[in-house]
């Protein structure tokens, strides 16, 4: 995720930590975890997603290997996190404009919405077991919430992105491929890290097919290439940031307008 001051906050999954990296710097700074793999409150275990909660000046972290969601203050003297939810097979996180927290669960094949501090939550996508039906998901990972509280879900092993309108009982398919990270702009254009095809896809609303806007020539390590892209984020200047997973780097691409 990219903060307003052009600081990138990165989930460093294999090193069990969250790192912030100011654009242009040669080194990042560990801001959560970083004390080896573990389950203590100062440790993380294979984190998969993070978001910035500006109202409380904190990070909310999906601590996947520990089956918990943590809140971690961004104050410099913070040494450990606080458990918001535990015993949850979380993968992706999002927050809407009313500060509801959304979490995908890869074992229950659902997305739930929570008020901060609530433990039970409300199912807003899936929840009907693993399956291919429009009311089902199969290991949902990354999620995005738009201004109307529609839920966009990377429905990983169904190889699709599903859109669930607020209070809907089933979703609609808005992308097919190998989705991981995703972002939806105000015109409902969908941007997806199509990890299996090593490319970033843009899919305008109503389009019958998408366009590759980065990568797409097979895996590679050149600046124009990607190798299993996972995370995806935009900054306020419309630049696209991609966690280029198997190249162990974050790539930045200026976004070209839709012709």
List the predicted regions and their residue ranges:
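Residue-level detector of Asp-centered blade-edge/turn motifs that repeat once per structural unit
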Residues: 2-5, 52-56, 95-98, 145-148, ...
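Conserved beta-propeller blade signature
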Residues: 7-9, 58-60, 100-102, 151-152, ...
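Beta-propeller domains
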Residues: 9-33, 73
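Short loop/turn segments immediately following the C-termini of beta-strands
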Residues: 13, 23, 55, 64, ...
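Structural signal for beta-propeller blades
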Residues: 16-19, 67-70, 109-111, 159-161, ...
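Gly/Pro-rich loop segments of beta-rich domains
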Residues: 25-48, 75-89, 118-141, 166-180, ...
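Loop/turn-rich, solvent-exposed surfaces of beta-rich toroidal or solenoidal domains
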Residues: 178-206
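Blade-level signature of beta-propeller repeat domains, shared across WD40, Kelch, NHL, RCC1
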Residues: 227-259
């Amino acid at each position: 995720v990219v903060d307003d001051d052009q600081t990138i906050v990165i989930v460093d999954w294999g090193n069990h930590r969250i790192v912030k990296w100011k654009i242009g710097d040669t080194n990042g700074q560990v801001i959560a975890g970083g004390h080896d793999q573990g389950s203590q409150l100062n440790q993380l275990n294979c984190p998969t997603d993070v978001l910035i909660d500006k109202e409380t000046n904190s990070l909310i972290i999906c601590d996947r290997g520990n089956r918990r969601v943590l809140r971690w203050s961004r104050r410099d003297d913070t040494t450990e996190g606080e458990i918001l939810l535990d015993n949850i097979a979380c993968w992706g996180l999002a927050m809407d404009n009313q500060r509801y927290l959304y979490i995908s669960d890869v074992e229950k094949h659902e997305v739930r919405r929570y008020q901060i501090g609530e433990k039970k939550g409300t199912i807003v996508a899936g929840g009907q077991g693993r399956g291919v039906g429009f009311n089902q998901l199969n290991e949902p990972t990354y999620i995005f919430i738009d201004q109307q509280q529609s839920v966009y879900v990377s429905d990983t092993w169904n190889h699709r992105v599903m859109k669930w309108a607020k209070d809907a009982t089933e979703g609609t398919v808005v992308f097919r491929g190998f989705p991981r990270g995703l972002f939806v702009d105000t015109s409902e254009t969908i941007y997806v890290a199509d990890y299996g095809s090593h490319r970033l896809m843009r899919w305008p609303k109503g389009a019958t097919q998408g366009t590759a806007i980065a990568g797409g020539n097979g895996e590679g390590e050149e600046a124009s290439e990607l190798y299993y892209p996972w995370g995806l984020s935009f900054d306020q200047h419309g630049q696209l940031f991609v966690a280029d997973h198997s190249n162990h780097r974050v790539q930045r691409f200026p976004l070209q307008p839709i012709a």
